[in-house]
C-alpha cells in the first residue's frame, strides 16, 4: 500500500528539493534534472500552497526568483496615481514655481527639498508588516505591471525592512536603474553575441525589469534609489525626515538631498550637480524640487497631470564632437525610411553613443553632411542622441556628400516621396519584411489587440513563414507553435489564449491596430465614434470624413486608400471570420441635449476632473469637441495654465471662457 504523505511534509520536501536544484543550477552551474522535471515540481508546490494557504511561507521558492519563464505580468491599479512632474529649464521658471507655491500657501513660509532626478524606471513598492508584497511599474500612472518577482532580485531593494518602527502598510516609490558599468558590460556581451545593443541605461533597465525570466534580471545587477514614502499611519513630519526614515529602514536614498530655505540655496545645489552628475555611477537627468511639509503639499494639491508642490529642473543637454562614419537606414511599419548616423563611439551623459538621429533627407541636405565629417552630438533630454552641427573646417577633401538612398534598405524597392511630405516611403507594403514585422508588432501592442507576444517571437514566427499579416495570428495552432525552439505546451497555450482574448478587444483598439497611416489612437477613437463598424467606415466618403473633428484631407485620403486595396479588404474579411470585434458593442447615446449644437474647446489643467472626463461630458451631453479656437467655438472650458495662443484668439473672436465650476453647474442643472 502506497504511503500517504501529509501535505505539510510534501510542501517542505518540495521546497528543500527545489532549493537544492536552484543551488546546483544557478550557483554551481551543474544541474542534475532537466527543466521539465523542475517545472513539474514547482507547479506541484504552487498547487499545494494554493490548496493549503496556511502552509505558505515568504521564503518559499515560489515567492522568490521564479522558474516560470513564460509568465506574463498582471496589470495592477495604483492606490494613488503615479503622476509625472512638470519640467523647467531655467531659473526664471524656478522663480515662477516659487511664486505659484507662495500664492497657493497664501504667503506662508515653506522649505524646498532638492534631490537628484534619476533617469530610470519608476517603481512602487508595497510593504505589509515590513515584508515586500508587491512591486508595480509606473505604467500609465493609473495602471502598472506587477513585476514583484523581478524586483526581488535587486539587492538594493529590501525584502524585509530593518528595525521595528515601520508602519504596518507602507508604499515606497523610487527608480530602478542600471549602473553605467553594468550597461557597458551587458552591451559588450550583446555585441559579442550578435544581439542588438541597448540605446541607453534607462531602456536597458526598463527592458530588464520586463523580462519574463527573473534569472536574467538577477544577472544584470540592477540598482534602485528611493525618494517617496506614503502610509495611512504616522510617518516623520516632513519629506526630508521621511527620506532619512526610509534610509534607516534599509532603503537606498541618495546622499544628494538638501533642505533649502531659499531660491539661492536651490540654485547652488543645481550648479553643484551640473558637473558632479557626470561622475555619478547611474544616470540622472535633472534635479527635483519638492515642498518639504506634507501638510503644505496637501494644500497645494495636484493638476490632472502633476503635483503643484514639485517640479523637475532639466539640465542643458551635453554636447560632444565625434566623427560621422556613414549613414544607414531603418524602415518603419508605415514604410517611412529614417536615416541613422553611425558615429565613432563617444561618451555622452555617462553612456557610449554610437548612433544618432538624422530625421529625414531634408535634414541631411540642410546640414550638408559628408562621410567622415566631424559633427556635434547632443542628447535631447539626456536620452535621444541627435546631430546639432557640423565642424566644416575639419572636413576632409576626400569626404563624399551623403545622398539619401533611393532604394528601400530592406527590400530594394524604389522609394517614393509624396508632395508636402518630409519622409521617403517604401511603397512595397505587402512585400517589405520590415514593414510586415512592424505592423505585426504594432497590432499586438497593449493599446491595440493586446496579444502577449514579444518581437523575438514575432521574428521567429515570421522566419518560419507562419505569419505575414495580422490575420495569420488567428490561424496559428498548438502543433505549429510546438515546433518552435523554446516553446512547450504551456507557452503555446498562453499565446493561443492571448490571441483568443484579443478577439474581444474594443473595435477602436482593433482599428488602431490595423496600422492605417496617420490613424493613431485618438483618431481611431474618433472614427469609431462616428462609424461604429468597420463596414460603415469603409463606405465613408472623403467629404464625410473631413467633417469629423481633427480629421483633415490627409487622414481622409489615407483611410480611403487603405480600404481601396484588395489585400486590406481580404484581411478584414479574415479577421471577421476569425471572430475579431469589428464593430462597437454599443452606440453612445447622449445623456442630455444641454450642449446640443455647441462646439467646445478644452484648454489648461483642472482640479475636479481630468480633461478626458470633461471631453466625455461634452460629448455625452450632445456637444462637439474641437481642438482649436474658431468663430464656430461656442465656449472654451478654461483651466489653469491655459494656452496663451488660445486665450489671445478667444479674446480676439469674443469667445466665452468658462471655468470648470461654471461648466459643472451648467451640466448639473
From Swiss-Prot:
Obligatory cofactor(s): Mg(2+); Mn(2+)
One Pfam family it belongs to:
Nlig-Ia
An example molecular function term from Gene Ontology annotations: metal ion binding
Binding residues for NAD(+), per the UniProt record? 35-39, 84-85, 115, 138, 175, 290, 314
Q: Which GO cellular component terms, listed alphabetically, does the Swiss-Prot or TrEMBL entry include?
A: cytosol
Q: Give the BRCT domain ranges.
A: 590-669
Active site as annotated: 117 (n6-amp-lysine intermediate)
Q: What is its EC number?
A: 6.5.1.2
User: Which sites bind Zn(2+)?
Assistant: 408, 411, 426, 432
Report the SUPFAM superfamilies cross-referenced here.
BRCT domain, DNA ligase/mRNA capping enzyme, catalytic domain, Nucleic acid-binding proteins, RuvA domain 2-like
Keyword annotations for this protein, in alphabetical order, are: DNA damage, DNA repair, DNA replication, Ligase, Magnesium, Manganese, Metal-binding, NAD, Zinc
Q: Name one GO biological process term.
A: DNA repair
Its UniProt entry gives the catalysed reaction(s) as:
NAD(+) + (deoxyribonucleotide)n-3'-hydroxyl + 5'-phospho-(deoxyribonucleotide)m = (deoxyribonucleotide)n+m + AMP + beta-nicotinamide D-nucleotide
CDD domains noted in UniProt: BRCT_DNA_ligase_like, LIGANc
Top EC class for this record: ligase
Q: Where is this region: Disordered?
A: 52-71
Check the UniProt entry and state the signal peptide residues, or none.
none
InterPro entries from the UniProt entry: BRCT_dom, BRCT_dom_sf, DisA/LigA_HHH, DNA_ligase, DNA_ligase_AS, DNA_ligase_CS, DNAligase_adenylation, DNAligase_N
Q: Sum up the protein's function in the record's words.
A: DNA ligase that catalyzes the formation of phosphodiester linkages between 5'-phosphoryl and 3'-hydroxyl groups in double-stranded DNA using NAD as a coenzyme and as the energy source for the reaction. It is essential for DNA replication and repair of damaged DNA.
Family under the similarity heading: Belongs to the NAD-dependent DNA ligase family. LigA subfamily.
Known PANTHER family for this protein?
A: CHROMOSOME TRANSMISSION FIDELITY FACTOR 18, DNA LIGASE
The name this protein carries in UniProt is DNA ligase
Native organism:
Porphyromonas gingivalis (strain ATCC BAA-308 / W83)
- The gene it comes from is ligA
